[in-house]
């Protein structure tokens, strides 16, 4: 026993020495999978940024009547110009047509949140993220109290995502790539992605149920998962919204357990309908699920993952049945 402990201590010391030495070696030898994992984490972080950003893009006026919100930040491009031609564009085209512009921003930032969090079309999302981050920086970088470097860093993050394998891990792109490979590993990738998202959704639903206990089940403004303090949120849900989220999670987990394409499709349909119901009530104060733009985008993430993985779940069984029928025929 004493010899075992001595050996274990030697291994721990050796491991710590190797880890410490690696900090001083040239940063040229990172394993491909480790780099992909870090890129995936950066992608998810960027997705959470956009997921929170959509929470205060509130139709129908997007802050125009009060001069706050999206309208106030857009007005900063004129009041505190960064690039005069851009300020002219905002003043003469964007502000006079602000409702159209506001909806465009909401759509683009929702798209960024969904694509980056789910790892779908990551390189396309990265390009859109660069453009959107640049437009935000050109609007508010010179506004008093703003930190210009935050916007240059946002641009840099999306450039990194564009040129790295950010869709290799925990991503729909990984499922698509595996499905196209000769090794036919698409089903395993789909199982991992759908199962992982099912767990995340279930934990979120449990927390939402706990926070909404004692409140009106159909309260127009549900409990928020996260908050403005850290600028991180997975949406807000009343008890009904939390139950719907739990149903989606249960369907996704059942789909991975039973290798069922139909259950995955069902999860996608429920999530898509929930998101659509929230979008149908944008601008109202009596949302059925107690949700927000962020809640709708989170449901859309679940829908995208469910539909994207459905075709691969149970694929091996279906191929075996087809082969058996062919032999029997």
Where are these regions (language model features)?
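Extended, low-polarity transmembrane helix blocks
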Residues: 2-82, 88, 93-107, 120-329
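Transmembrane-helix motifs of polytopic, lipid-linked glycan transferases
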Residues: 111-118
